[in-house]
Amino acid sequence: MRSILLTLTALLGGCASYQSLTLPETEALTRDVTQLKVEASAMPGAELAAHRFDPSDGFDMTELAMLAVVNSPDLRLARAEAGVTRAQAFSAGLLPDPQLALGRESVLGSPAGATVAFTAGLTVDIAALLARSATKGAADAEARKSNLDLLWQEWQTVAKARLLFVKLDAITQSQAVLGRQRASLRQRLDEAKRAVERGLVTNDASTPQLTAYEDANRQWNDQERQRNQAQHDLDALVGVAPEVSLPLVGSSDVTVMDATQVRAAIAESTRRRPDLLALQAGLEAQDDRYRGALRAQFPAITFGPTRARDTSNVNSAGFSLGISLPLFNRNRGNIAIEAATREKLRIDYQQRLDATSIESHRLLDEQAILQKQIAEIDASLPALEQVAEQASKAYAAHNVDSLTLTNIEGALLARRLERIAARQALQEQAIALQALLGTSVNLPERSTGASRTHLVEHTS
């Protein structure tokens, strides 16, 4: 008995102990991005992995995407969830603990030759041992699925960062065009007001400039509101405090995939896209659960040695065997559930494949429409710019009125803004297509230990 107590004490000494977890009382947004040390080799895309992260000179499109991957609050939560899945995989691989049963009986009274009786037995759940391979296989597949789901979320976060970069760049270009137009209109409006004050013209002469100026102001303010929204969306995406400045530098140009590249990427999507690979791993996990449910329909067995002594001091040894009788249940309910779940996952996978093909071709067609639109705008702009320049000279020579000049300049302004919007839309479609097809994603090795949690560390 003493040896048993010592064994139990030793086992308890190896147990995990409770540690309290304190909830934060303030926000934890990043206020100094220069303190972020990024592990570029762990980035989800080949372009990101080959890029040097240096926030000291501003953020180009790739650096902004890298910042989003390492510092996004949503991705932090996703990595924590992936940690739970890995812990579950670890738990599934542990062997079941044996069960120890002890009993003691004392004799009432004092009969001659009587002694204290005891029983001791050790049993092991054989069924759990037999089911371990299926359970462990399902857990490992779920861990791979979690890792691939996280990789897909990182890739989509990269796309979101790129989209915001493109949007902010387009807003900057639009405001530059509107700013020049506002300045020109403001100058002519002031000249018209001075002419009215001197009695050279009537108030009607300044109406076209005033109307055009107010319209340009309205468009400027609309762009300013869009900038504010996009900037706060970016702050939330990359997890920085609102007062942190994120100067954007460099080009917003995006490589546009052609039809041949898209078709090739669609054909490779089942081997390249992390979300499809995650669904494959999920189906593999469900297949193992289905196998486990089939095995569980057979009798559950427990077995182990026993040792006993009765009150007459007779010792005995033997074994115990427990078998469940599969007469009514036979695990048929769980078998049906796991089979139906497996079929649902197969249909989900097929639906994802179909949606990929449909959406890819839609984006490809939209790219072609936008490219044609931009080409038409580029073809018409030089002539329109020439007409506007001639009208400006004619207005200065008092050969055309302000209404004619304002209409021509308004048409030129609208065409320039249309080109900026069309270029933005083309870049957004190209980013969406790359995000959908996942052509340059760095895939992890097929391993449950391929964790994606260590992408960044804070340096002091």
Each model region followed by its residue ranges:
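Terminal intrinsically disordered/low-complexity segments used for targeting and assembly
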Residues: M1-L67, E224-A264, A432-S460
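Small/polar, glycine/serine/threonine/aspartate-rich low-complexity segments that form flexible
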Residues: E47-G58, A101-A128, T135, S245-A259, ...
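A glycine-/polar-enriched beta->alpha junction
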Residues: V70-L77, G83-P98, A120-A138, L148-W155, ...
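Periplasmic alpha-helical coiled-coil/stalk elements that build and connect Gram-negative outer-membrane
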Residues: R132, A141, L148-E268, L363-E366, ...
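A short glycine-centered flexible hinge/capping loop motif at secondary-structure junctions
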Residues: V196-L200, Y395-N399, L436
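Alpha-helical heptad-repeat coiled-coil segments that mediate oligomerization/polymerization in large
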Residues: T202, T356, L363, H398-S402
